[in-house]
Amino acid sequence: MPVIEVRGAAKTYRRRGKPAEKAVDGLDLVVEGGGVHGFLGPNGSGKTTTIRMLLGMVRANAGELRLFDRVVPDALPELIGDIGALVETPLFFPTFTGRRNLELLAITAGVAPARVDEVLATVGLLDRSSDHVKGYSLGMKQRLGIAAALLKKPRLLILDEPSNGLDPAGMVEMRELIRRLGADGRTTVFLSSHLLGEVEQVCDHVTILARGRCVVSGRVDEVLASRETGDVRVRVADPEGSRVLMEQAGFTVTSMGDAHSGLRVHGVDDPAELNRMLAERGHYLSELAPIAADLETVFLDLTKDAS
């Protein structure tokens, strides 16, 4: 059973004196249970609007949205304990400690006090839980927000740009946390992000939006494999001499780093023919390997007309 299922969802915003803005346009989306599912798209592609529709914050104009096979927003009151979310910058009492903020949330949610320590440990804030929130870094506040979202032991955790504004150290901590949460065997993490490297490193599945529609969805490795670059990496004893020969044969060749990293040969239709051509001229390859597309390349290719 899918955790999230969206069929033909549409949302148009209408503002007085301005043209209608179609944020989501016939979106189909399926998120199976388990792991981390990345949700990507350019600014204005409908990611946040989709999340807001799933959480009942805005209503769809058309289509159907389901969580755990229940139609939302109607079923949200019954599902609320199964869903945790961090959609905007979390708000806490700044002069209270991190622990006290969570204790108050636990009381209102009917959660046992012992759960507070559990979620603080999960997000790595147990040793800072007695500090006032006003002294927390942005990354710590984001992690405290995730701790709050985890209080009810949700089966689905929805995160909208959790790494926004974080410094490099904070981003590393957030990636590690998301990876752990997705690996716990109980929680499905639905991660909306514009950070392609983050998604490629932590996600098992990915969906890419453009102009409010899904343009590709699947396992990250399968999505990348489906977009072959046609480029190959070659290693050879005489890289400069080989480069001259390949360029004379009409290939575009770029360096992949230092002399030990090899050369990238672009748009190779027949790698065996490239190998034969070099061998006939006394340049024998120690490596000839296809270069898979990375998520950034796939993303830019699929969304280039939507940016």
Where are these regions (language model features)?
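Conserved protein kinase catalytic domain
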Residues: 80-84, 120, 175, 221-224, ...
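ABC transporter nucleotide-binding domain
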Residues: 175-266
